[in-house]
């Protein structure tokens, strides 16, 4: 094996840094194999000051980078920025590409999905025969669809028809059903008024007959 090359002492132009492999904690730069201090002008205080200066510059550059990112995010016209920010020791930190936040969705309406309750023919949901017979109507052939209690509750006792909200009922069928119900109401009203008029006429005729008989007997 060859002899190791002697280590040359650093000159004044060499940077003082804790990263220097020849730096020792005994206030000197010592060459390998030599215990005598070399370069007495070199002191650890200068090295520490240089290291602190580098750390301060790095911290300042990091703060500038964070400020740039925050300002870029807060701006709506940021776009793609690749600004280079200088850092000590010849290093360069490129700002990450920042994009403006996506605009909030405006004008979106909530869609409500209505699900129809499935009817079952189980023994618990079936209507008793007596209840079914009590609600069946033969007026205009309108017979309620009997099945579950929910369907029985939707049955309109006044019109005698089953009120269905299913998709099978079109607009024309709905209008026809409402028209039949209105016609039945008007017919019932006309019948009631006719009966009331007949009763009133009969009562007036009876009263007039009684009064006429009384006056005829008085003035004989």
Swiss-Prot record:
Lineage: Viruses, Duplodnaviria, Heunggongvirae, Peploviricota, Herviviricetes
Family label: Belongs to the alphaherpesvirinae envelope protein US9 family.
GO terms under cellular component: host cell; host cell Golgi membrane; host cell plasma membrane; host cell smooth endoplasmic reticulum membrane; membrane; viral envelope; virion membrane
Compartment(s) where it occurs, according to its Swiss-Prot or TrEMBL record: Virion membrane; Host Golgi apparatus membrane; Host smooth endoplasmic reticulum membrane; Host cell membrane
Topology, Virion surface side: 216-220
Origin superkingdom: Viruses
Pfam families: Herpes_US9
GO term, biological process aspect, one: intracellular transport of virus
Function as written in the Swiss-Prot or TrEMBL entry: Essential for the anterograde spread of the infection throughout the host nervous system. Together with the gE/gI heterodimer, US9 is involved in the sorting and transport of viral structural components toward axon tips.
Topological type in the membrane: Single-pass type II membrane protein
Main location: virion
Motif Di-leucine internalization motif location, chain numbering: 145-146
Region (Acidic) residue spans: 151-169
UniProt PTM comment: Phosphorylated on serines within the acidic cluster. Phosphorylation determines whether endocytosed viral US9 traffics to the trans-Golgi network or recycles to the cell membrane.
Protein name: Envelope protein US9 homolog
InterPro entries in UniProt: Herpes_US9
Keyword vocabulary terms for this entry: Host cell membrane, Host endoplasmic reticulum, Host Golgi apparatus, Host membrane, Membrane, Phosphoprotein, Signal-anchor, Transmembrane, Transmembrane helix, Viral envelope protein, Virion
Membrane-spanning ranges: 195-215
Residue positions where Phosphoserine is found in the record: 164, 166
Residue intervals annotated with topology Intravirion: 1-194
């Amino acid at each position: 094996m060859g002899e190791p090359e002697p280590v040359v002492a650093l000159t004044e132009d060499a940077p003082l840094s804790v990263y220097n492999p020849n730096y020792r904690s005994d206030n000197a730069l010592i060459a390998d194999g030599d215990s005598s201090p070399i370069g007495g002008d070199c002191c650890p205080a200068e090295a520490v000051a240089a290291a602190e200066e580098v750390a301060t510059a790095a911290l300042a550059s990091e703060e500038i980078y964070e400020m740039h990112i925050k300002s870029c995010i807060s701006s709506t016209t940021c776009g793609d920025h690749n600004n280079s920010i200088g850092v000590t020791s010849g290093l360069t930190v490129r700002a990450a590409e920042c994009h403006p936040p996506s605009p909030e969705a405006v004008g979106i309406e909530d869609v409500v999905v209505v699900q129809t309750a499935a009817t079952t023919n189980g023994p618990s949901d079936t209507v008793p025969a007596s209840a079914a017979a009590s609600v069946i109507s033969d007026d205009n052939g309108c017979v309620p669809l009997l099945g579950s209690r929910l369907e029985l509750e939707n049955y309109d006792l006044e019109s005698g028809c089953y009120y269905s909200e299913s998709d099978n009922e079109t607009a024309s069928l709905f209008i026809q059903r409402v028209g039949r119900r209105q016609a039945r109401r008007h017919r019932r009203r006309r019948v009631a008024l006719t009966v009331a008029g007949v009763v009133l006429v009969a009562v007036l005729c009876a009263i007039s007959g009684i009064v006429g008989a009384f006056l005829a007997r008085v003035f004989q």
